[in-house]
Amino acid sequence: MSKNTINLQDNVLNQVRKNKITVTIFLVNGYKIRGLIKSFDNFTLLMEVNGEQQMIYKHAVSTIIPGKTLNLFSDQSDKNDQEQ
């Protein structure tokens, strides 16, 4: 990947984690999980659900729905404006 490539997955996960936005996650088996993303890596999500931690493997995730609209490209456009 080039240096300027935007990683949408990491941007979404970072924004909901940093802003403590509640997410609803649907797994491939249809199970629904609602909570906060505390951390993530290439393979897993660590969530806080009802005061308890759950580690979820990304390959089991079907859909992630943030509790509010995200502004994904504001940080990237601010960086581009500063570089010019």
Curated annotation (Swiss-Prot):
GO terms for molecular function: RNA binding. GO terms for cellular component: cytosol. Gene3D superfamilies: 2.30.30.100. CDD domains: Hfq (cd01716). Residues 10-70 form the Sm domain. It comes from the Bacteria. One of its GO terms (biological process) is regulation of RNA stability. Keywords: RNA-binding, Stress response. This is RNA-binding protein Hfq. Homohexamer. RNA chaperone that binds small regulatory RNA (sRNAs) and mRNAs to facilitate mRNA translational regulation in response to envelope stress, environmental stress and changes in metabolite concentrations. Also binds with high specificity to tRNAs. Pfam families: Hfq. Signal peptide: none annotated. Belongs to the Hfq family. HAMAP family: Hfq (MF_00436). InterPro entries: Hfq, LSM_dom_sf, Sm.
